[in-house]
Amino acid sequence: MESIMARFVRHRKFCRFTAEKCINIDYKDLVTIQHSIIESGKIIPSRITGTRARYQRQLARAIKRARYLSLLPYTDHHQ
């Protein structure tokens, strides 16, 4: 039983933006934004990334603005 539980040890998640002491997330910073979306274009939730709620809201707003200005695609492929 202990070997099964050892397999599911979770590492402590930390907020990347707090560690970098980032104040605001900008929609023009595509390198930062692209780390928070998957290939299909969906925003990765904070329960997976460990991002704090304040920065997750800023990140979602920046991604939506970048999509609106065609800096990021809405989906992976349009056919």
From Swiss-Prot:
A cellular-component GO term for this protein: cytosolic small ribosomal subunit
Gene Ontology biological-process annotations: translation
Keyword Ribosomal protein: yes
InterPro entries: Ribosomal_bS18, Ribosomal_bS18_sf
Record key words, sorted: Ribonucleoprotein, Ribosomal protein, RNA-binding, rRNA-binding
Subunit and interaction comment: Part of the 30S ribosomal subunit. Forms a tight heterodimer with protein bS6.
NCBIfam families on file: S18
Protein name (record): Small ribosomal subunit protein bS18
Native organism: Blochmanniella pennsylvanica (strain BPEN)
